[in-house]
Design a protein with these regions (language model features):
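Extracytoplasmic/periplasmic domains immediately adjacent to an N-terminal transmembrane anchor
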Residues: 526-708
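Conserved ABC transporter NBD signature motif
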Residues: 60-71, 78-80, 324-334, 339-340
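Catalytic Walker B motif of ABC-type/P-loop ATPase nucleotide-binding domains
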Residues: 162-165, 420-423
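Conserved ABC ATPase "signature" region
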Residues: 104, 108, 115-133, 364, ...
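Helix-to-loop junction immediately C-terminal to a conserved catalytic motif
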Residues: 52, 316
């Protein structure tokens, strides 16, 4: 009976209205390297995410490692038997932690004691050649070294099922070869371990033991590479994949034919001499020189981070070079030379389209930016040529990846540029769309004489260029026609030739040996509890180390509460004391002066310069200079002596209603006291008021001091806000870097992915608050 690593039964998955998986049923054999192949967006990552437990199963059934992955108990029991590397360079790593600290964190997750963690870490570092860099932060490693470290973190507990989501995308061929050699040596020591890999590289997938080809969320073929080639009568896996696609999708596709280039007279289209770009102490491009003729297709070959995109940005004027010169059509590159820039078409690595606009509106906007009169016929021509007419009113975000790529190219060539600069234009696109894209480039080069400068890390694309420049670590390793470079190295393929140049640049590769397995039994026997204090402590310790190295977050955590206490304690005050007031005495009588003297004797009021007119009174109240103005009208004293009813104006600043209401109470009390004293002095009797207000009076005079009321509340507010904000920042950083998958995989159901950091920050701030108090 055939053993299976995983069995999928009618598995479906949706993201909103988009269907990622549509009833997938497949049995993946155990003990081999099984590959899921297909371009971006076909559902490979979703399938692996469901298998690893990172994503929640919504429809269908998955069996793996002897149980149902839909069961929370089984997922909890088998998580120590599964290792998962998410898509992207080192996406399961923590960039501020060193190589050893990353491994130590994963060892703690699986409950390994300190002695075993040290031994296993040393073995893995020696096996992968990372032992010279134990203290280097993961964020400062090269792409290949990040992938090796990510693999070490996945292997520290000796899993039975290793899940790799496009593990070599963007790394150089030498690092890719070393990565798979390491996997091969590891499988020699553990032949029963199953490896499931997602890959969009057909040349890489040809080395796997078993394949499942996917398209639009469905399986289109399964079997060994030889079986798939035999089934489709194809010579390469890429040709086989094209043959397996639905007829509607590959309609009109034909084999790519590249006619020879006919040299054109005139100066070179692009020429760079000693081009250098530095970012602080880091040199991204190091004295790069090349010459590209008119109508030539020139390729920049290299891994992510080698300097290709930076060089292209310098040629377009987006980045001023630190050293060196560059010319376009014989003119120096100048960011302010709009005429020269209008002769350049640029297609960035990430789609630079306007998501709020439709396909047609994106083209119209670009025509307006380049000041193209009568661009309607040109837009209609491009929409017809690139098959965009049926999508004219659709937004770019809703389009398939291949259609979006065609729109990006149409925008780049709308103004008929003489130079077309393309930065990784076909990454993630299916082979049919890639061939159509290249056919358009070949037509523009051979028919229209457009110079095309394209960067790529795909060897089959580099082989289509007239000339290529192999680049690594900001330097050009070799330049020439692809066949000449292969011949010069005595290699069989362009990849072998590139690897040879990389080995020459890096020195002889070291002989790496894989250490024997020692942690499997302990990891497999580790008890699985609903809440594991060891895992909680691992996350808390890791976040503490990250926080200590993040000066911005650390300053916010330590200084934020102090600033908040000072700001809230002294900046927010409801104290009604020493209120500035001014007199607007238009009577100047003995009675008016006696009235104003009652304010001068109160500790709640502080006299300011008198007001001379109403405009001044309004201005001083609005600016906050005064909180109270006492307006005594003309003839106030005479009306008072004649037993008339004089009017008195009290103007209050109502910007703070609480203070204004309290001030009004104080003024009312002063007025009652004044009229009572006036009545006693003139009649010998207290004043008889027409209405008597009865109010409850405490035996003490209530006094509201904000500092005693606000600051204790601020301390409690900080204990709520600061840890929550720090946790939110931490979770967002985890999600952006991709390491949030570690939370989802390793934390038990019901235990929030941010609980560890939240509890740590609560404990820390509680202690800090006690010290500050």
């Amino acid at each position: 009976m055939t053993a299976y690593a995983a069995v999928f039964d009618a598995v479906s998955h949706r993201y909103g209205k988009a269907t990622a998986l549509d009833g997938v049923s497949v049995a993946i054999p155990a003990g081999c390297i099984a590959g899921l192949i297909g371009p971006d967006g076909v559902g490979k990552s979703t399938l692996l995410g469901l298998l690893s437990g990172v994503k929640r199963l919504r429809s269908g059934r998955i069996k793996a490692l002897g149980g149902d992955m839909g069961s929370a108990r089984h997922r909890r029991d088998c998580r120590v038997r599964i290792a998962y590397m998410p898509q992207g360079l080192g996406r399961n790593l923590y960039p501020t932690l060193s190589v050893v600290e990353n491994l130590d964190f994963f060892g703690r997750l699986f409950g390994q004691p300190a002695s075993e963690r040290r031994a296993r870490t040393g073995d893995l570092l020696v096996s992968t050649g990372l032992d010279p860099y134990p203290d280097r932060p993961a964020g400062k490693l090269s792409g290949g070294m990040k992938q090796k470290l990510a693999l070490c973190c996945a292997l520290i507990h000796e899993p039975d099922l290793l899940i790799l989501d496009e593990p070599t995308t963007g790394v150089d061929p030498l690092s890719r070869r070393q990565f798979w050699e390491l996997i091969g040596r590891m499988r020699v020591g553990r032949p029963g371990m199953s490896v499931v890999v997602a890959s969009a590289d057909m040349d890489e997938a040809a080395q796997f033991d078993w394949l499942a080809a996917m398209n639009a969320g469905r399986l289109i073929a399964t079997g060994s590479p030889a079986e798939i080639l035999s089934q489709t009568h194809a010579d390469s896996l890429e040709e086989a994949f094209i043959a397996l696609l639905p007829e509607a999708q590959r309609q009109g596709h034909k084999a790519l034919v590249i006619p020879p280039r006919v040299p054109r007279p005139g100066p070179p289209a692009i020429e760079a001499t000693g081009l250098t770009m530095r970012f602080g102490g880091f040199t991204a491009v190091d004295h790069v020189s090349f010459r590209i003729e008119t109508g030539e297709i020139f390729g920049f070959l290299g891994s992510n981070g080698c300097g290709k995109s930076t060089t292209m940005k310098m040629l377009t004027g987006l980045l001023p070079p630190s050293e060196g010169t560059a010319t376009l059509f014989g003119q120096p590159v100048d960011a302010h030379d709009l005429q020269t820039r209008k002769r350049i078409g640029y297609m960035s690595q990430s789609f630079s389209l306007y998501g709020e606009l439709t396909v047609r509106q994106n083209l119209v906007l670009d025509a307006q930016l380049f000041d193209l009169p009568g661009a309607g016929p040109r837009i209609a021509e491009l929409m017809e040529h690139y098959g965009l007419a049926t999508f004219a009113d659709s937004r770019p975000d809703s389009l398939p990846l291949g259609i979006r790529q065609r729109l990006q190219l149409a925008v780049a060539v709308l103004h008929r540029p003489g130079i077309l600069i393309l930065d990784e234009p076909t990454s993630g696109v299916d082979p049919v769309e890639r061939d159509r894209f290249w056919q358009s480039l070949i037509d523009m080069s051979r028919r229209d004489g457009v110079t095309i400068f394209i960067s790529t890390h795909f060897m089959n694309e580099a082989a289509r260029c007239d000339r290529i420049s192999a680049m690594n670590a900001g330097k050009v390793l070799a330049e020439g026609r692809p066949e000449d470079l292969i011949r010069a190295r005595g290699a069989h393929t362009l990849e072998d030739a590139f690897i040879g140049y990389l080995e020459d640049a890096a020195g002889q590769p070291r002989n790496e040996q894989l250490a024997p397995a020692r942690a499997a039994a302990r990891a497999a026997g580790r008890p699985n509890r609903l809440f594991d204090p060891g895992r909680c402590w691992a996350y808390a310790l890791r976040e503490t180390m990250e926080l200590r190295r993040d000066r911005m977050r650390l300053a916010f955590a330590l200084l934020g509460p102090i600033v908040m206490m000072i700001t809230f304690g002294f900046g927010i005050s409801f104290d009604v004391k020493h209120l500035a007031y001014a007199a607007f005495d238009q009577d100047q009588s003995l009675q008016s002066r006696t009235l104003l003297q009652s304010f001068e004797g109160s500790r709640y009021f502080l006299a300011a310069a008198p007001v001379t007119d109403k405009a001044q009174m309004q201005r001083r109240l609005i600016t906050g200079e005064l909180a109270l103005v006492v307006e005594v009208p003309p003839d106030f004293g005479r009306d008072l002596l004649n037993a008339r009813t004089p009017e008195l104006g009290i103007w209050l600043d109502g910007a703070m209603p609480f203070r204004a209401e309290t001030t009004r109470g104080y003024v009312t009390g002063l007025m009652l006291q004044y009229f009572n004293e006036l009545s006693v002095g003139s009649t010998g009797q207290t004043a008889q008021l027409a209405s008597v207000n009865v109010a409850v009076r405490f035996v003490y005079n209530p006094d509201f001091l904000s500092v005693f009321a606000i600051v204790p509340g601020v301390i409690m507010l900080m204990l709520v806000l600061i840890p929550a904000m720090m946790t939110a920042v931490s979770v967002v950083q985890e999600k952006e870097s991709g390491s949030i998958a570690n939370f989802r995989r390793h934390l038990s159901p019901g235990w929030s992915s941010c609980s560890a950091s939240r509890h740590l920050m609560w404990w820390w701030h509680s202690r800090a608050s006690c010290r500050w108090r």
